[in-house]
Amino acid sequence: MENKINVVMLCGRGQSSNMMFNGIAHHANIVGVIFDNKVSTKIMARRRIKNLGIIKVVGQVSFILINKLLKRVSMSRITQLALSYDLNDAPPHENITTYVDNINDEETINLLKKYNPQAVVVNGTRIISKKVLSSINAPFINTHMGVTPKYRGVHGGYWSLAMNDSENCGVTVHLVDQGIDTGEVLYQGFIQANENDNFNTYPIHQIAKAIPLMKAALDDARNNCISIKEGVLPSRLWYHPTILEYIKHWIQRGVK
């Protein structure tokens, strides 16, 4: 492909970021990858307790702990899906990789100005500050594992199925603003999960669907023809399920 777009990636540390990197690596000229450090569990818990209350958060933490075991059980299915979708989770080469304590640090801004990309691909970071978003003249484009704005927040694929809304089980590629998954929609795609899938395998279907959508968004950015599309309403912010919510939806709807 001629005249590849110059891209910087701002990423969380994890499998989906590596898969996105490798998925677009031959389509774009990725000049730098900046990995965000994970927000501490203590800080996250304090925020959740303030917003949701301690009982809800205890239920969420209980689910997160149980899900570590469920993820181990799901590894064979995850591997199977990654192979079937030809997904590669090898990390980016060290010579283009930088690790920062916080994606909103001055170091990130300095790197963005140094690289001066035509677009910034975002995957799995904390909320990006206005100072970072305005530091360069380039679109910041995020992959969200859910259909926005109806399934903002986390685990949008799971929640759409748990709410008996399988037609809106999908993924969104959108511009980044200062809200939580509130940026304008560029592309959306939908997935088909089956009885072999669960909480830990839905994201594999979603990242596979997202990669070609991100490529299309980068083509639009390269050609200066980004087009905004309507999302799916109503808007709602979702969090981790509690252990009781997870069990309830598994029993009532077979959503694991």
Predicted regions and their residues:
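One-carbon transfer enzymes
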Residues: M1-K256
